[in-house]
């Protein structure tokens, strides 16, 4: 199904009916509204003006459209900020943020939590029983604009309580944090401050706990809203729209309270922000990198326990990246079908009409500001027509699992030990290598069952808890661990037995030294898989095992014991591809050597091919394949769908 984000409050009421009619005629079924409308719903304290929203919902419902109603807590109104200025967050430099944008509140503020409770309750009581309202989106893009981590007095107070609940005694905290170092010992929890504005870097254990606390505060704020919506809107779904390449909060944890996950897909903006080689950025400037959207579809399908929506789909140029090119003709259609191929239940475009005013006036919509349809509209309408003629099969478990850990991202943010070290970069390297082989991937959290997967990839898991170790033990196929796995304890210390810590129960080896390498400084590793120049990161391993790859100094780069492999270096794309191809072959999976820019995804018995390149390519379909969309020749920025005989 397809949907759209709509802002009736931005347009004259006389236009609403025509907009709703055109939405229906375009094949759209769902419309998200209301997520930034608090000041219009409550222009003054206690004076509620529901009439316009009542009318907007009724107008959409009259055309058979289903409404996704956003709770308006991402934008507290000016009168609320003036009455309670303490709700404004404080940045890491100690500066109080101001009114005039969005997301201007602190998750720990008791006052703001009560105000959020009040407005969400009123909203749910009024609209929770309406047939036209299919469900609710809580808030909007938690953490956008660097807002997960606040440094206000309320956060400090709440953090102290969080620490006491976690450690019980200040002696236990001192032991966990290693506060004997630099004379950091605390006599009570009341002495612990937030980890910022220190002369030298803060204690890494302190920082990690603060990041955990901040993520927990977002989850608590979201849960407050979910509980209200469950009570007053039974039978309605509750979701939240997460962001791309964003790790400040643990989406796996937060989504436990949701019916499914949603995310906002902007492939061109994300590609422009990625640390890609310049030539690759140029190659995919108008399409997005072929694995950007797919990675997030697979991630948020995992976050949503098998269910996800794209709540905002890029329809044209955006306004927030360093450069904002227009999508190549056909890409809006391709992105939409790609989301559906990965299991999206709804793809909703942002937005119906480009705003002529304010901060996002340069952000394209399905229509121009003068209401004329734009590129995205025509491509969305085509998808709707194609969808009407097809019944998508269910999504099956992928053959490969990739273990993704938000806590790992926090640990490497706290202690990268190398300027180029990026957890997301390493994850993306492995994910992209799998996709280039034509393999489908499920992204799962640590501790998720790995049964049924041909093999699993763990790009890096610094803290290995018992539930994760048990899942690795029960895995039926090979498990590949990347560098720095098992390198930290839960309190951010080096394991007494040395890394990989608990993984030594699976792999008899010790990492005794590590180094980060500046760009251009390479170590060569070679073995049965080939010869590979490697950079960025290298580890020295002691093990009673014969390495599968060896550095030129004779030290091992890749080890294996039974089903388990450990890679003691940052892999090159070539090494990742060769190693993953070997594991796939061992597991009996068919791998392909796909042309540059071509990617596949299977959904049931259907195979989807997406061509991100400027040249036509041949679809890797069998002779007897039955094409449902397109043909064996997949044109530039086009797709094909077929069913194998």
Curated annotation (Swiss-Prot):
Gene3D superfamilies: 3.40.50.880, Glycosidases, Golgi alpha-mannosidase II. InterPro entries: Beta_galactosidase_C (IPR013739), Beta_galactosidase_Trimer (IPR013738), Class_I_gatase-like (IPR029062), Glyco_hydro_42 (IPR003476), Glyco_hydro_42_N (IPR013529), Glyco_hydro_b (IPR013780), Glycoside_hydrolase_SF (IPR017853). Optimum pH is 6.5. No activity is detected at pH below 4.5. Inhibited by Cu(2+) and Fe(2+), and moderately activated by divalent cations such as Co(2+), Mn(2+) and Zn(2+). Considerably activated by dithiothreitol, beta-mercaptoethanol and cysteine. The trimeric structure is essential to exhibit high enzymatic activity. Belongs to the glycosyl hydrolase 42 family. Optimum temperature is 70 degrees Celsius. It retains more than 75% of activity after incubation at 85 degrees Celsius and the half-life at 90 degrees Celsius is 1 hour. Thermostable. One of its GO terms (biological process) is galactose metabolic process. GO terms for cellular component: beta-galactosidase complex. Its EC number is 3.2.1.23. It is an enzyme of class 3 (hydrolase). Homotrimer. GO terms for molecular function: beta-galactosidase activity; metal ion binding. The active site is at 141 (proton donor), 312 (nucleophile). Zn(2+) binds at residues 106, 150, 152, 155. CDD domains: A4_beta-galactosidase_middle_domain. Keywords: Glycosidase, Hydrolase, Metal-binding, Zinc. This is Beta-galactosidase.
